[in-house]
């Protein structure tokens, strides 16, 4: 290996920032000839020049056709799906036959709502409506990328951020940008990361706009006003500043870097969050008081999952119920399979659908394979296969006591209230 490329570095993913910091520390000693390249069409060059003054800057104009940009403000009480429909009616119907219109939406919920509305719209009866997001199986993703047949005038592709930079979609002449993105954010009260809907950055908007000019001249409709454009951030904040510190700390422990205070970060993780994460991992028995991996922590680090989910899986393995543990880990790491079904919050009800749910079943199967690499479990009996106890082992902060005389209201062990 002579070069390590960090593509789409403007996204500032936490894994990319961590890998860059580790390489910048190790390369001068172990591989001074190793080249590190940060790539993107929308890099924050002024900031990177300040942080990496020795770095050489290479710029390439590439090939891109002109893209005409329009702004469309939302009308009073106009839902996002109706904004998308209005933009399509105004701009898509005059496109050449077989063209594609790529609609950027923040997530699956918005994609499904738009698909429902557009499928019933009279103006789009001869248009194929396709969806594209990261939870789709690969064959379904590939199907969304195909040109429409002669029976359709064109294709509307309702996409998440996966279409921003990861793939090329043929025949796209129109981009409709909702201006919204999902941003990863850690909630210390739950001990889990979640996705928050936020206005997308100008760098993201420029990436999306460029999709309309890959193969021919195109148009981009932004569903916000020029005034709102001025208030948007230039770049998204680095994930490292908002992410769960526990997986990062486990990586640093394997590296022998402690809290990472001496690493050459571009943006160092917040020290308060790192200290809290360190305390949590020590309480879970994954790190020793000196910050090194415990025997359980070393075993868990081979699984490649979140520390809490890995601990749940190891606990299940020790009790002889590995499949149950992997089913639970899959449920806790993927979208709720019963979302929108008025199914309450019962974990057992969700366990019953794992094997029928394609994404969850495949994820659980992968986790079971990872557990098998550790060798046979200590016991093969299944006498204590209790889902709640397994989850509690990984998330002790979720233990709650019902408040006297207040059905459905609980007091969590750390003192916060909860409503079921």
Regions found by a protein language model. Give the residues of each.
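P-loop NTPase motor module signature
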Residues: 1-312
């Amino acid at each position: 290996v002579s070069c390590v490329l960090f593509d789409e570095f403007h996204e500032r993913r936490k894994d990319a920032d961590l890998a860059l910091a580790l390489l910048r520390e190790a390369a001068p000693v172990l591989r001074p000839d190793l080249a590190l390249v940060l790539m993107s069409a929308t890099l924050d060059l002024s900031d990177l020049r300040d942080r990496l003054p020795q770095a050489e800057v290479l710029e390439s104009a590439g090939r891109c056709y002109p893209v005409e940009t329009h702004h469309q403000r939302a009308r009073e009480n106009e839902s996002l799906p109706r904004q998308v429909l209005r933009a399509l009616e105004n701009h898509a119907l005059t496109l050449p036959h077989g063209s594609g219109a790529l609609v950027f939406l923040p997530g699956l919920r918005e994609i499904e709502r738009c698909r429902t509305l557009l499928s019933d719209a009279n103006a789009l009866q001869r248009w194929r409506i396709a969806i594209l997001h990261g939870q789709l199986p690969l064959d379904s993703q590939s199907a969304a990328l195909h040109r429409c047949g002669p029976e359709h005038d064109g294709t509307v592709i309702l996409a998440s951020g996966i279409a921003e930079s990861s793939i090329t979609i043929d025949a796209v002449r129109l981009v409709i940008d909702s201006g919204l993105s999902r941003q990863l954010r850690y909630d210390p009260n739950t001990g889990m990361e979640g996705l928050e809907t936020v206005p997308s950055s100008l760098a993201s908007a420029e990436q999306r706009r460029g999709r309309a000019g890959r193969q021919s001249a195109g148009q981009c409709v932004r569903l916000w006003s020029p005034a709102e454009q001025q208030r948007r951030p230039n770049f998204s904040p680095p994930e490292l500043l908002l992410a769960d510190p526990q997986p990062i700390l486990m990586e640093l422990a394997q590296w022998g870097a402690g809290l990472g205070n001496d690493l050459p970060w571009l943006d160092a993780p917040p020290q308060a969050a790192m200290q809290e994460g360190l305390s949590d991992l020590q309480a879970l028995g994954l790190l020793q008081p000196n910050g090194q991996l415990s025997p359980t922590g070393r075993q868990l680090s081979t699984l490649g999952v979140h520390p809490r989910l890995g601990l749940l899986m190891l606990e299940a393995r020790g009790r002889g119920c590995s499949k149950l543990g992997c089913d639970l880990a899959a449920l806790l790491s993927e979208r709720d399979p019963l979302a929108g079904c008025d199914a309450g919050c019962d974990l057992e009800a969700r366990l019953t659908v794992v094997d029928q749910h394609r994404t969850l079943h495949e994820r659980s199967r992968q986790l079971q394979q990872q557990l098998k690499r550790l060798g046979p479990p200590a016991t093969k009996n299944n006498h204590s296969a209790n889902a709640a106890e397994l989850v509690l082992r990984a998330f002790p902060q979720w233990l709650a006591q019902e408040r006297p005389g207040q059905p459905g209201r609980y007091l969590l062990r750390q003192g916060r209230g909860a409503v079921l």
